[in-house]
């Protein structure tokens, strides 16, 4: 911390003591506002300077917020007060507020939180402003804000001290307001479709529902090992068995994996399940829901991301994974039969694989390494191999593949789901195959879940499901390059 900064902090503490000496509480209590800055502008900005003079008796307002600018000498001055909705100018005159309150104004620092009561007027330049009749200090700020002209330039500091980022960066505030709206519109859409929002456990006895490493914790009283959930899936499908035919949950999921611009150890997902639907129905629902959210939150289903226009309005492409790989590489996995041929093709195309990988794993590696990043416009990739889809129903026409899809936009997976496997015998066999993979070193392979098998044995109707990473969807709809830009408090390494 610089000497200048230390000096500023010292001066602010001296002012704090002066307030106490005057009997003024520098950390005040309630203040009744008549509205936000945007409300005042909407109501009063339509009038001319002269009209506001005529309406002065009816324009009494009360606002509160943080002082962001301050200027003026002598017996009057201007400032901008910032609240959730933006900023509005205030004008403080000694002959209007009195000596004591004007002294408060003179000694106020940028960053202080103030309350102002007054009337609306326009300056000679036409800026709508509040002429103060009463000035109140609500909270004394003991640290100076980042430089007002340059803001918070250090990206890491923005993530570590999000509160400063929100104070100084209007774009960040807008991103998180839109994040809230996106989730709300998701709820509105599903509730209007008859879905029921539910809550299921975050600590599991078995880590299941996804291919991922879990965080492990311990329940002291029960002396039991528990896992932070890596997916919401298996509990929701138990509810389908129980007769709750359309359910969804929006919640946190935890995966013990690396941190990147796309990944955070804890993130937010929505998972939903609909009885008597299949993966075609869920693709339709996904497309419709995302389009609805974009239109409601942004006013358009054509969004800008990283300089490109992403068209969510037009019909989305649907492409089988084998066809996608063939288009990109010329390799037709419908015709590839032996393990030796698959491994030779992988080597020829520079695909890194492990010796234990089978047909489905190698096909998936081709897709992830050669196709995924090229899918800029919304594209459903469907028909994933059985080996990598232990919870998905096999395709009846070709059991090498499943009735599963993933949604890719701007080269990233945004959704994943399938027609759910509801055959308990087949499901148990898939889990057993996953245990073999785990024994061979795949630490993301699925555990056996006997309780879930038992639930399926009571009968689960044909069901379609969906999982969407909300953080990535928010990244797309807010043109944010990193997942840390859409998480209020992303994981950061300890200093």
UniProtKB/Swiss-Prot annotation:
InterPro entries: Aa-tRNA-synt_II, aa-tRNA-synth_II, aa-tRNA-synth_II/BPL/LPL, Lys-tRNA-ligase_II, Lys-tRNA-ligase_II_bac/euk, Lys-tRNA-ligase_II_N, Lys-tRNA-synth_II_C, NA-bd_OB-fold
Keyword tags: Aminoacyl-tRNA synthetase, ATP-binding, Cytoplasm, Ligase, Magnesium, Metal-binding, Nucleotide-binding, Protein biosynthesis
GO MF, one annotated term: magnesium ion binding
Residues reported in the UniProt entry to bind Mg(2+) 2: 413
Gene Ontology CC terms, in alphabetical order: cytosol
Binding site for Mg(2+) 1: 406, 413
Reactions catalysed, as given in the entry: tRNA(Lys) + L-lysine + ATP = L-lysyl-tRNA(Lys) + AMP + diphosphate
Cofactor: Mg(2+)
Location relative to the cell: Cytoplasm
The family this protein is said to belong to: Belongs to the class-II aminoacyl-tRNA synthetase family.
One GO BP: lysyl-tRNA aminoacylation
Enzyme Commission number(s) from the entry: 6.1.1.6
Lineage: superkingdom: Bacteria
Keyword Mitochondrion: no
Signal peptide: none
Cofactor binding, note field: Binds 3 Mg(2+) ions per subunit.
Chain segments annotated as transmembrane: none
Protein name: Lysine--tRNA ligase
Subunit structure: Homodimer.
PANTHER family in UniProt: LYSINE--TRNA LIGASE, CHLOROPLASTIC_MITOCHONDRIAL, LYSYL-TRNA SYNTHETASE
């Amino acid at each position: 911390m610089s000497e200048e900064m230390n000096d500023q902090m010292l001066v602010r503490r001296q002012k704090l003591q002066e307030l106490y000496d005057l009997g003024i509480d520098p950390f005040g209590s309630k203040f009744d506002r008549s509205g936000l800055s945007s409300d005042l502008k909407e109501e009063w900005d339509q009038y001319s300077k002269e009209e506001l003079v005529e309406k002065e008796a009816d324009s009494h307002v009360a606002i509160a917020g943080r002082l962001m600018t301050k200027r003026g000498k002598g017996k009057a001055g201007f400032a901008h007060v910032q609240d959730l909705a933006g900023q509005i100018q205030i004008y403080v005159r000694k002959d209007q507020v009195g000596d004591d309150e004007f002294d408060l104004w003179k000694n106020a620092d940028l960053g202080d939180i103030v309350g102002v009561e007054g009337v609306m007027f326009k300056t000679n330049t036409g800026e709508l402003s509040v002429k103060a009749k009463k000035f109140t200090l609500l909270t004394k700020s003991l640290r100076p804000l980042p430089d007002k002209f340059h803001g918070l330039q250090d990206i890491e500091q923005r993530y570590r001290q999000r509160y400063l980022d929100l104070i100084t960066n209007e774009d960040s505030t807008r991103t998180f307001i839109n994040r809230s709206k996106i989730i709300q519109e998701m709820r509105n859409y599903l509730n209007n479709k008859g879905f029921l929002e539910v809550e299921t456990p975050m600590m599991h006895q078995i880590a299941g529902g996804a291919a991922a490493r879990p965080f492990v914790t311990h329940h002291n009283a029960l002396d039991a090992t528990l896992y932070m959930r890596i997916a919401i899936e298996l509990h929701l499908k138990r509810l389908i068995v129980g007769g709750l035919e359309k359910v969804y949950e929006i919640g946190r999921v935890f995966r013990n994996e690396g941190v990147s611009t796309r990944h955070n150890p804890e993130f937010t997902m929505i998972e939903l399940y609909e009885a008597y639907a299949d993966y075609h129905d869920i693709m339709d629902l996904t497309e419709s829901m995302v389009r609805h959210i974009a239109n409601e939150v942004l006013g358009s289903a054509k969004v800008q991301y990283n300089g490109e226009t992403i068209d969510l309005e037009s019909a989305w492409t649907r492409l089988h994974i084998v066809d996608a790989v063939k288009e990109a590489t010329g390799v037709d996995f419908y015709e590839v039969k032996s393990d030796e041929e698959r491994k030779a093709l992988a080597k020829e195309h520079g695909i890194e694989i492990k010796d234990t990988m089978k047909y489905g794993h190698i096909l998936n590696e081709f897709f992830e390494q050669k196709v995924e990043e090229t899918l800029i416009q919304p594209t459903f990739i469907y028909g994933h191999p059985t080996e990598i889809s232990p919870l998905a129903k096999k395709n009846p026409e070709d059991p090498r593949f499943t009735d599963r899809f993933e949604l890719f936009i701007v080269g990233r997976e945004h959704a994943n789901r399938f027609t759910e496997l509801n055959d308990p015998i087949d499901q148990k066999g898939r889990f057993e195959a996953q245990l073999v993979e785990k024994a061979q070193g795949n630490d993301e392979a699925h555990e056996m879940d006997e309780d879930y098998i038992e639930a399926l044995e009571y009968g689960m109707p044909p069901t379609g499901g969906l999982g969407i990473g909300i953080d990535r969807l928010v990244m797309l709809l807010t043109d944010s390059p990193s997942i840390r830009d859409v998480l209020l408090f992303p994981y950061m390494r300890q200093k």
